[in-house]
Amino acid sequence: MQDRIRKIIHVDMDCFFAAVEMRDNPAYREIALAVGGHEKQRGVISTCNYQARKFGVRSAMPTAQALKLCPQLHVVPGRMSVYKSVSQQIQTIFQRYTSLIEPLSLDEAYLDVSESTAYQGSATLIAQAIRRDIWQELNLTASAGVAPIKFLAKVASDLNKPNGLYVVTPDKVQEMVDSLPLEKIPGVGKVALEKLHQAGLYVGADVRRADYRKLLHQFGRLGASLWKKSHGIDEREVVTERERKSVGVEYTFSQNISTFQECWQVIEQKLYPELDARLSRAHPQRGIIKQGIKVKFADFQQTTIEHVHPALELDYFHELLEQVLTRQQGREIRLLGLSVMLKPELQMKQLSMFPSDGWQ
């Protein structure tokens, strides 16, 4: 464990885009609802409510496939300007309790409340207060996880969804990690999970007892990362938007995709709007020096392309996508990401936007 015990909260809004639509239109509250593109335009689902999820509908799923699973699904186009505005209201609530806020998207964020004096420094009470404020002021529900380390806070926020809170105290970290199924750990996808199971690794305790060198040999960086997490170690800090040299968003597909059109729909309808909103928060002047795109294939090989570009433009990502997919070689795609490098205030540094440990 780390010497300094931190208090990290991960807040995740419940089916955010769909929840905003249900809040603003009572007719949507009792039906299976999704926000996404039209099936005739090969659209994809941005998010859906829990009624739709019961039928297997998921984010980034082609709308046509979602309608086959749930014929009564009502699909509405997204109102990104509204979602951005609500996200800003949520950020304002966070700021009452801490300035150490790391947004991951419009609907989720890490908060470090280690030094907060609110509620006598109780992270549990702060998380309860944040969820209460969001409900009372915005009529939306949020789930939260509290833990001394980031990845467990994120795991915990999912355990009592929707509209729930789960707290992992420092003395319970190792116990929770030991019993945690590996598929619950962020970054462990289907293919990796199969390989882990083939190696006899199913829960955190299995990894903790494994030989580190064998893990590194078999699984590379993933093995090293899992070994640390299995010992309750996650040294990543909560990084505020203004501390960043780059801003990025990415999405791991529940089912691999393969075509340019599928990739472009996800970029246009999901990733680009989120990147646009995050850039506005991180750098209101919107000064950038590069745009980049990242693709991870089904075989876990990753490739990136980044080019100098002075302004965020959707059409430029179209060009970058065409270029990066020339490296596809028939492989399916499991992850897609976009990023921009911010223009520093004093000096332009040519740093990679896609560091080896991934975007935070």
UniProtKB/Swiss-Prot annotation:
<dbReference type="InterPro" id="IPR050116">
    <property type="entry name" value="DNA_polymerase-Y"/>
</dbReference>
<keyword id="KW-0548">Nucleotidyltransferase</keyword>
<dbReference type="GO" id="GO:0005829">
    <property type="term" value="C:cytosol"/>
</dbReference>
<keyword id="KW-0238">DNA-binding</keyword>
<feature type="active site">
    <location>
        <position position="108"/>
    </location>
</feature>
<dbReference type="InterPro" id="IPR043502">
    <property type="entry name" value="DNA/RNA_pol_sf"/>
</dbReference>
<feature type="site" description="Substrate discrimination">
    <location>
        <position position="17"/>
    </location>
</feature>
<keyword id="KW-0460">Magnesium</keyword>
<keyword id="KW-0479">Metal-binding</keyword>
<dbReference type="GO" id="GO:0042276">
    <property type="term" value="P:error-prone translesion synthesis"/>
</dbReference>
<feature type="binding site">
    <location>
        <position position="12"/>
    </location>
    <ligand>
        <name>Mg(2+)</name>
    </ligand>
</feature>
<comment type="similarity">
    <text>Belongs to the DNA polymerase type-Y family.</text>
</comment>
<keyword id="KW-0963">Cytoplasm</keyword>
<dbReference type="Pfam" id="PF11798">
    <property type="entry name" value="IMS_HHH"/>
</dbReference>
<keyword id="KW-0234">DNA repair</keyword>
<protein>
    <recommendedName>
        <fullName>DNA polymerase IV</fullName>
        <ecNumber>2.7.7.7</ecNumber>
    </recommendedName>
</protein>
<dbReference type="InterPro" id="IPR001126">
    <property type="entry name" value="UmuC"/>
</dbReference>
<dbReference type="GO" id="GO:0000287">
    <property type="term" value="F:magnesium ion binding"/>
</dbReference>
<keyword id="KW-0808">Transferase</keyword>
<dbReference type="GO" id="GO:0003887">
    <property type="term" value="F:DNA-directed DNA polymerase activity"/>
</dbReference>
<dbReference type="InterPro" id="IPR024728">
    <property type="entry name" value="PolY_HhH_motif"/>
</dbReference>
<dbReference type="GO" id="GO:0009432">
    <property type="term" value="P:SOS response"/>
</dbReference>
<keyword id="KW-0239">DNA-directed DNA polymerase</keyword>
<dbReference type="Pfam" id="PF00817">
    <property type="entry name" value="IMS"/>
</dbReference>
<dbReference type="GO" id="GO:0006261">
    <property type="term" value="P:DNA-templated DNA replication"/>
</dbReference>
<dbReference type="InterPro" id="IPR017961">
    <property type="entry name" value="DNA_pol_Y-fam_little_finger"/>
</dbReference>
<comment type="function">
    <text>Poorly processive, error-prone DNA polymerase involved in untargeted mutagenesis. Copies undamaged DNA at stalled replication forks, which arise in vivo from mismatched or misaligned primer ends. These misaligned primers can be extended by PolIV. Exhibits no 3'-5' exonuclease (proofreading) activity. May be involved in translesional synthesis, in conjunction with the beta clamp from PolIII.</text>
</comment>
<keyword id="KW-0235">DNA replication</keyword>
<keyword id="KW-0227">DNA damage</keyword>
<feature type="domain" description="UmuC">
    <location>
        <begin position="8"/>
        <end position="189"/>
    </location>
</feature>
<dbReference type="InterPro" id="IPR022880">
    <property type="entry name" value="DNApol_IV"/>
</dbReference>
<comment type="subunit">
    <text>Monomer.</text>
</comment>
<dbReference type="InterPro" id="IPR043128">
    <property type="entry name" value="Rev_trsase/Diguanyl_cyclase"/>
</dbReference>
<keyword id="KW-0515">Mutator protein</keyword>
<dbReference type="InterPro" id="IPR036775">
    <property type="entry name" value="DNA_pol_Y-fam_lit_finger_sf"/>
</dbReference>
<feature type="binding site">
    <location>
        <position position="107"/>
    </location>
    <ligand>
        <name>Mg(2+)</name>
    </ligand>
</feature>
<dbReference type="Pfam" id="PF11799">
    <property type="entry name" value="IMS_C"/>
</dbReference>
<dbReference type="GO" id="GO:0003684">
    <property type="term" value="F:damaged DNA binding"/>
</dbReference>
